[in-house]
Regions:
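Helix-turn-helix/homeodomain-like alpha-helical modules used for DNA recognition
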Residues: 61-88
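Short basic helix-loop element that most often maps to the first helix and adjoining turn
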Residues: 9-23, 81-84
């Protein structure tokens, strides 16, 4: 299932990783004006949104779909094996 985060969730994801819109543009190869439009509630092609999601996921974020909980969101994903290392 493709994740389609809202404008608020996209802004929150960008804040979590500490990126400017320019940083996100450089990593995702999506133009800064398009990112700005999306963060202000505008529409975009599915491929464009997925490029942003992929960039954030590569930084360790996980998107929470509205169907998974009582609301959508974004959070840090625990990298595989990290918990095991912390327990040693």
């Amino acid at each position: 299932m493709a994740i389609n985060p809202s404008a608020d969730v996209l802004r929150a994801a960008r804040a979590l990783v500490g990126w400017t819109q320019r940083d996100l543009s450089d990593v995702s190869k999506v133009s800064r004006p398009t990112i700005n439009r999306l963060e202000n509630g505008g529409a975009a092609m599915v491929e464009t949104v997925q490029a942003l999601v992929k960039a954030f996921e590569a930084q360790g974020l996980e998107f929470i779909d509205v169907s998974q909980t009582s609301g959508e969101g974004v959070r840090w994903r625990t990298p595989a094996g990290r918990l095991e290392q912390d327990l040693r």
